[in-house]
Amino acid sequence: MANIPDAAVPDTGTIAGRLDRLPITRTHRRATVAVGLGLFFDFYEVFLTGVLSSVLVEEFSLTKAELPPLLASTFVGMFFGALLLGRLADRFGRRGAFLLNLGLYSLFSLLGAFSGSALMLLVTRFFAGIGLGAEPPLADTYLTDLLPARKRGRFIAWAYTLAFCGFPVVGFLARGLTEHEILGIAGWRWLFVLGALGAGAVFLLRRGLPESPRWLESVGRTEEAEHLVAGLEAEARGGVDENPAPPRGTTRKRAAAPVRELFGPALRRRTWMMVVFQILQTLGYYGFGTLVPLVLAAKGYAVSQSLLFAALTYLGYPVGSALSLPLVERVERKYLVVGSVLAMAVFGIAFGYSGSMALILVFGFLYTATSNVFSNAYHIYQAEIFPTALRSTASSGTYSLSRLASGAMPFVLVPLLNSSGPTTLFLVVAAALVVVAVDIAVLGPRTTGRRLESVNDEVAQPLR
């Protein structure tokens, strides 16, 4: 008889226990790729408007007062999308919310490609943002639910490593297409078309993903959860029946946990920690990526040069994400978040002071690389610290505040850049990042290598 790893043997324990005992299967890998590709187009889209900011100023003859609303429109849409779709994922399932958000984004990104005015582009960016808003927290929640504890961090980091390739891709595509017309259509419009078509392809890929067994169990659909876990166990043993027909029996459904539990005695410390974290971290993470072409223009570089430099610094995003792979399971994620965000503050100040092309590229690359060690660690971390019944609501709800802060960011940082220059801009950003580090260091629990139920048992009593 073939030797079967202990992790592959069906467990008679809970659904969560059996999921955590599984080895990595083909379904886990397929889910990681499908989630990573969806995130790829999320980040592609988020940075697209910022990368094109200098191009759109010329295309639509935008004034300094008209540019910030256009930059903010996607983020404001993402705020509403994260709130609405994140809650839907806890009430009606992760998979359906996944499909809805990609469908909305793909449709409105395609419509945005045919914008005849800045107003139409602003409106389509807003609705595309609604579709995109919940993508990262939904991705974090879904993979956190599905993956076994000992591999959770590494595979979520792999998904984000794939996703972060979207940053240099959009940078180099913008550099290559914006100065040309293809089939009589301006190159910048093709960037929106490519994003829409790519997201549509990922939509089709995600239709084959299973629902989260942890979520099914949390709402009382235990027979369906049992069926999915049994399929994963059979797959782990080399069985061929990976997706048999679900059972027809009825199950008792439970209502989703009320949102007020997030501010109850059990969870309010973690909730408020993430509120502060999400509002301030976006100044450092998206503030750099969105505004770097404008920062380079303020340093005296032409539009074409600033797009090239931005694309080169964006290479740090996938590199940093890849560097995080051996770290997220070996270093306590709480301290990895703290250390990397402090490094971002240092490199950001150095970038602001840089006056030569070489220093701009070096510190820009170091900043983006470090920021994705930070990003991977926190995306894993934020989903681990809330119980299954509220995981998507909590992750998406607090994440939505980062989108709202990103929407306000152009109205604060662009005038600051124009009035005080890049150095002052990055000093302000660094101060925000130091507060983020203190917030997590003081209030955050440890999570690395722990089962989700263990991380949340210490606060779960009032939820039972």
Give each language-model segment a name:
Residues 1-464:
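Transmembrane-helix signature of 12-pass secondary carriers
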